[in-house]
Amino acid sequence: MKEKIAYLGMGIWGFCLASLLANKGYHVVGWARNAELIAQLQTEKRHPQVPDVPIHPNLSFTTDMAEAVENASMIVEGVSSAGIRPVSEQLKTITNLNVPFVITSKGIEQHTGLLLSEIVVEIFGNDASQYLGYLSGPSIAREVLKGCPCSVVISAYNPDTLKKIHNAFLTPTFRVYPNSDLKGVALGGALKNIIAIACGISDGFRFGDNAKSGLVTRGLHEIRKFATIMNCRPDTLNGLAGLGDLCTTCFSSLSRNTKFGKLIAQGMTVAQAKAEIGMVVEGVYTALSAYQIAKHHKIDMPITTGIYRVLYENLDIQEGIAALLQRNTKEEYL
């Protein structure tokens, strides 16, 4: 009998990783609230966002969360950052966490400033920490689905949990590197989306590669400063969860955050750009949370502040660019 894994969330990234696990021989049950999506997956055997990819026979779908998690040896979530609280609350009514719970979403909760792992612990209690894992890194879903080589990191507080998750996801083309700094891994994946929006704006104005590389480098500096204040290891941000994810998100034509930045640079409103993309743009929500936390801790994050002001205070983009370029220069410190 195949080992069962429950996957909560069937967006393109959830479908991608669920397919990877199914290909490894696991019986994967994908869950989503969207009954129309689940019906389409069941009947058409294709995901609407990647219709060229057939559904693996080891992958089935349901709208019943209890059915999805029953007898599962691992639970993986792939919902939006805004969805992890209601999904975790629903899961709590069904079961306590006593198997590895893998977070694959990237973000910071608005208004509370909590990392997604902290939300899960708040709902399930401190004992849940031993089952928590975090998967992050430079990973475009469509490339992973094609079997292109990809390297990510897995982090967990408990060594046994880390080993189980590592072994579940590792394939010849999906390289999984352990990292014990769960908070740093989580922050790297969340904050890079803000910098990606800035890079998209740069693309929209055709500022070129020099400007974009400058944004990526100074953006990484902001992320490292933020993470250090939050008691993360700075070296984590030099690896796959930081620099690696940042580069992919900022330079890939498939990045929704970069696309979003480009669209607003071309004159769309925030609402219009989000509607055009048609998927969650996590950087929009993370910008608010990161700005509020940075302000509270007095962390100087000019790129993040600029993006926040454009998105939430209607700052003219040209004025925001001018403000960045007119800042006093100082000794480069990375």
Swiss-Prot record:
Residues binding sn-glycerol 3-phosphate: 106, 137, 139, 192, 245, 255-257
Catalytic center residues: 192
Residues annotated for NADPH binding in this entry: 13, 33, 106, 141, 256, 280, 282
Disulfide pattern: none
Keyword NAD: yes
Short name of one Pfam family: NAD_Gly3P_dh_C
Cited InterPro entries: 6-PGluconate_DH-like_C_sf, 6PGD_dom2, G3P_DH_NAD-dep, G3P_DH_NAD-dep_C, G3P_DH_NAD-dep_N, NAD(P)-bd_dom_sf
GO biological process: carbohydrate metabolic process; glycerol-3-phosphate biosynthetic process; glycerol-3-phosphate catabolic process; glycerophospholipid metabolic process; phospholipid biosynthetic process
EC number from the UniProt entry: 1.1.1.94
Reactions that this protein is recorded to catalyse: sn-glycerol 3-phosphate + NAD(+) = dihydroxyacetone phosphate + NADH + H(+); sn-glycerol 3-phosphate + NADP(+) = dihydroxyacetone phosphate + NADPH + H(+)
Compartmental location: Cytoplasm
PROSITE patterns: NAD_G3PDH
Pathway listed: Membrane lipid metabolism; glycerophospholipid metabolism
Keywords: Cytoplasm, Lipid biosynthesis, Lipid metabolism, NAD, NADP, Nucleotide-binding, Oxidoreductase, Phospholipid biosynthesis, Phospholipid metabolism
GO molecular function annotation: glycerol-3-phosphate dehydrogenase [NAD(P)+] activity; NAD binding
NCBIfam families, sorted: PRK00094.1-2, PRK00094.1-4
Protein name listed in UniProt: Glycerol-3-phosphate dehydrogenase [NAD(P)+]
Species this chain originates from: Chlamydia caviae (strain ATCC VR-813 / DSM 19441 / 03DC25 / GPIC)
Highest classification ranks of the organism: Bacteria, Pseudomonadati, Chlamydiota, Chlamydiia, Chlamydiales
Gene name of the record: gpsA
